[in-house]
Amino acid sequence: MFARYGRTTLTKTLLLCLAAFFCALLLPTLVQIPVMTLSLLMVLFSLYFFRDPSRTPVGNASAIVAPADGKVLLIRKTDHPFTGKNSTLVSIFMSPFNVHVNRIPINGRVTHLEYHPGKFLMAFDHNSMSDNERMDIGIENTQSKVFFSQVSGFLARRIVCHLTNDQNVRAGEKFGMIKFGSRLDIILPSQAEIALEEGKKTRAGETVVARLPNITT
């Protein structure tokens, strides 16, 4: 299964590579083989990149799940206007080889949605969180608030977000993607009990990032 957010890019890539493949037939053999090989590799990588495997929802109302596949780059305390004082920032780095479909971390309603144009610093640069192009999203329910950002990077220059203000969402739902790698920052309220550590690998919609106390399924 392939991500619907990448269908246009995937179609363009396939057509371009197909054209290059057949044009290579008119070239000398020494040039023909590398062009055909490169075209085939580009097609295979595109198909691999835009894959969209099924995920099993956690099914626990107290769980805040990872919004992205990747590796936890940073965990630190921070104050934030949406989640309040003593919140926790968890940054997830997505390499070009991760699944790039993003998923909702918690049940609730979208109450904040804001796009910020910006730079394209490397995802490992901590300034990328504030300086890079990003889409900020805030979700709240009767018990809690969660804020997260799709952050573009040096290679990832296309953020896709199919959310609207006041939209009701459920944890694990697909909502967009960041094409060709970068990071996703999630900010959790002070009462959230962090359930992972730096270096941990995550799976969107399945890995529990934190738990909210006194909330039952």
UniProtKB/Swiss-Prot annotation:
Gene it is expressed from: psd
Cofactor: how and how many bound: Binds 1 pyruvoyl group covalently per subunit.
Record note on modification: Is synthesized initially as an inactive proenzyme. Formation of the active enzyme involves a self-maturation process in which the active site pyruvoyl group is generated from an internal serine residue via an autocatalytic post-translational modification. Two non-identical subunits are generated from the proenzyme in this reaction, and the pyruvate is formed at the N-terminus of the alpha chain, which is derived from the carboxyl end of the proenzyme.
Pathway linked to the protein: Phospholipid metabolism; phosphatidylethanolamine biosynthesis; phosphatidylethanolamine from CDP-diacylglycerol: step 2/2
UniProt xrefs under PANTHER family: ARCHAETIDYLSERINE DECARBOXYLASE PROENZYME-RELATED (PTHR35809:SF1)
Keyword terms of this UniProt record: Cell membrane, Decarboxylase, Lipid biosynthesis, Lipid metabolism, Lyase, Membrane, Phospholipid biosynthesis, Phospholipid metabolism, Pyruvate, Zymogen
The UniProt record lists the keyword Disulfide bond: no
Catalytic activity: a 1,2-diacyl-sn-glycero-3-phospho-L-serine + H(+) = a 1,2-diacyl-sn-glycero-3-phosphoethanolamine + CO2
Function in brief: Catalyzes the formation of phosphatidylethanolamine (PtdEtn) from phosphatidylserine (PtdSer).
Annotated active site: 182
One example GO MF annotation: phosphatidylserine decarboxylase activity
Family assignment from sequence similarity: Belongs to the phosphatidylserine decarboxylase family. PSD-A subfamily.
Localisation per UniProt entry: Cell membrane
Enzyme Commission no: 4.1.1.65
Site (Cleavage (non-hydrolytic)): 181-182
Alphabetized Pfam families for the sequence: PS_Dcarbxylase
Name of the featured protein: Phosphatidylserine decarboxylase proenzyme
Quaternary structure note: Heterodimer of a large membrane-associated beta subunit and a small pyruvoyl-containing alpha subunit.
GO terms under biological process: phosphatidylethanolamine biosynthetic process
Originating species: Prosthecochloris aestuarii (strain DSM 271 / SK 413)
Keyword Membrane: yes
